[in-house]
């Protein structure tokens, strides 16, 4: 019997540690500003359970080389899936850095980013003691009809409804914008910081009016 897999959820990942040092340095001011914006909240409730988000990074030239790299890789990611990218212009809709609270509790509940074609993560500060991304089964029909898995299964199998990746500094992950994802609760043992981005593929006839 032939085993065929159709309609896969494609996730790319690689290790690119060469960006870590410069992007951590460039990110420090953004995380500092994000914490200052939350100063009153921290004073009242403490530094627990928070995720400190930066302002947009799309126009900061300290991130230019990285932005060009992930922009090209995101284009290649779509092209690899068979899309006719000669008809589309890829545009960053969002690019930001964030850091979880030092005293722990930082997390993201499961979500998607509306009207995006490519999403991605690049990890700047993390370890086996920090949070990590969790991805969920994107097919509604499959989620509705899941069965109980065998108790001794190891690894990721087609029947699983979610899986996680354990990154290290320099890990880059690219995935479809429709893929639901979340971040496990961080315990505040070691710093956790990462860059997140979203990209839209806009028809060139439309893109020429906005670029």
Annotated model-derived regions:
Residues 154-211:
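Catalytic core of Fe(II)/2-oxoglutarate
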Residues 17, 123-125, 198-202:
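Solvent-exposed residues in well-ordered beta-strands and their adjoining turns
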Residues 59-91, 101-117, 124-128, 207:
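Active-site region of the double-stranded beta-helix
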Residues 7-11, 117, 192-194:
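Short hydrophobic/aromatic beta-strand or adjacent loop that forms the aromatic wall/cage
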């Amino acid at each position: 019997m032939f085993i065929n897999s159709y309609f896969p959820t494609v996730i790319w990942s690689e290790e690119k540690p060469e960006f870590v040092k410069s992007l951590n340095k460039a990110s420090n001011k953004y995380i500092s500003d994000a914490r200052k914006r939350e100063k009153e909240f921290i004073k009242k409730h403490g530094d627990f359970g928070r995720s400190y988000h930066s302002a947009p990074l799309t126009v900061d030239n300290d991130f230019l080389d990285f932005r060009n790299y992930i922009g090209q890789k995101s284009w290649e990611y779509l092209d690899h899936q068979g899309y006719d990218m000669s008809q589309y212009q890829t545009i960053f809709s969002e690019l930001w850095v964030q850091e979880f609270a030092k005293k722990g509790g930082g997390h993201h509940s499961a979500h998607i980013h509306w009207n995006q074609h490519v999403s991605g993560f690049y990890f700047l500060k993390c370890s086996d003691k920090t949070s990590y991304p969790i991805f969920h089964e994107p097919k509604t029909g499959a989620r509705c009809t899941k069965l109980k898995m065998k108790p001794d299964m190891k690894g990721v199998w087609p029947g699983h409804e979610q899986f996680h990746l354990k990154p290290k500094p320099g890990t880059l992950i690219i995935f479809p914008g429709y893929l639901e994802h979340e971040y496990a609760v961080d315990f505040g043992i070691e710093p956790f910081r990462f860059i997140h981005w979203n990209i839209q593929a806009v028809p060139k006839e439309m893109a020429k009016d906005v670029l």
